[in-house]
Amino acid sequence: MEKFQGYLEFDGARQQSFLYPLFFREYIYVLAYDHGLNRLNRNRSILFENVDYEKKYSSLIVKRLILRMYEQNRLIIPTKNLNQNYFFGHTSLFYYQMISVLFAVIVEIPFSLRLGSSFEGKQLKKSYNLQSIHSIFPFLEDKLSHFNYVLDVVIPYPIHLEILVQTLRYRVKDASSLHFFRFCLYEYCNWKDFSIKKKSILNPRFFLFLYNSHVCEYESIFFFLRKRSSHLRSTSYEVLFERILFYGKIQHFFKVFVKNFPAILGLLKDPLIHYVRYHGRCILATKDTPLLMNKWKYYFVNLWQCYFSVWFQSQKVNINQLSKDNLEFLGYLSSLRLNPLVVRSQMLENSFLIDNVRIKLDSKIPISSIIGSLAKDKFCNVLGHPISKAVWTDSSDSDILNRFVRISRNISHYYSGSSKKKNLYRIKYILRLCCVKTLARKHKSTVRAFLKRLGSGLLEEFLTGEDQVLSLIFPRSYYASKRLYRVRIWYLDILYLNDLVNHE
């Protein structure tokens, strides 16, 4: 953060949110390259191979392209066929991707500085483990066990392109950046496929920045609810909501509810809501009755549609009863499990038994969806029977083995919080046998003959690294009794969603 601060102290552009001059600064391309442009498609996947993309990248080409925009009244990048127009040996689609990610990096830097300055002196700045995806689950274990219902909401996409531009207008002050931003969106984006689940020419980094900016817009309703509730406690991100329109909406909400809808205001006095947003979805957990949950659903849908221009379909808001329904959350199936307990109480000479029930959050692995994802990537068939990975037979034996071991360890690491490890062992078995079949196919042998020739030591690499570490942490008796395999373990170093989660 201090490094970015030093780069952007050249004038008052940072204080006034003037971003357009940064496109023509020499050092900004070095900064953008270091900030992550060279790692645009770095392999964070556990199933797929690296795309040879970063070798084509050149920050000089991006700057050259921006400068050439002013040489003609029409840009050098035609829009009819992005894949067949070449400039310096690259397609027009490639150039748009480079410009879009550069725009995202330049816009991210001032906001990162402002966000970091707002947390100065606060304890949150040192809590790096909050970045982990698994850090959400211990929170849910403590909170969801006291709730009855959950609203599972699929976050909608903006119905019009101009809404995204209007969202940035309250944060970016100079018109030049907005015009450049609007031009890129209108000219090069296929808005019929504007979905995070579909293949789009939008760069992922560029898309996620726009998407999160827009989501923060209609998440502002929760600031109003927070003022009406003594229980709603959330991290304050004031820097993301510094705009006049937002405060105007909050005041308007308050006036409308107080004057015209006193009955509705009673619903908001003590809602006791916990809100989590993740992977294009969000959940709202509460202790309300089914009638009140339907009211919440109705009010949220209408507020987002009427005030934030978001086409929010009511069928994308599901009401789940935690004691009966499973909640699909970050690749886990979560539900409440009732554990009966018998407590023996003794008073003087009399003793009696008390039946008690303990509510516990149960997190399970969605084995059917994971097997479907493995089948789609040719690790097994739809029934879960392992098959050989034919496309990897050209690699060396060590490379094939390392690929399968890496996939197995990542899956084991991510799903270590499952309360039932049987499904996890089944997934690891599929990958282990798929590895053996792939090696046997490469050497034109059968699985039995291949294992007999090399021995069972070939598969010892599949022993996960966390098993070896946990054996040193826990007592030997505890580890030897196999109780460790029934314990849920949440890790604080998981920063990316597993590829098997909602994989299409």
UniProtKB/Swiss-Prot annotation:
Its main location: plastid. GO terms for molecular function: RNA binding. GO terms for biological process: mRNA processing; RNA splicing; tRNA processing. It holds the Pfam family Intron_maturas2. PANTHER family: MATURASE K. Belongs to the intron maturase 2 family. MatK subfamily. Usually encoded in the trnK tRNA gene intron. Probably assists in splicing its own and other chloroplast group II introns. This is Maturase K.
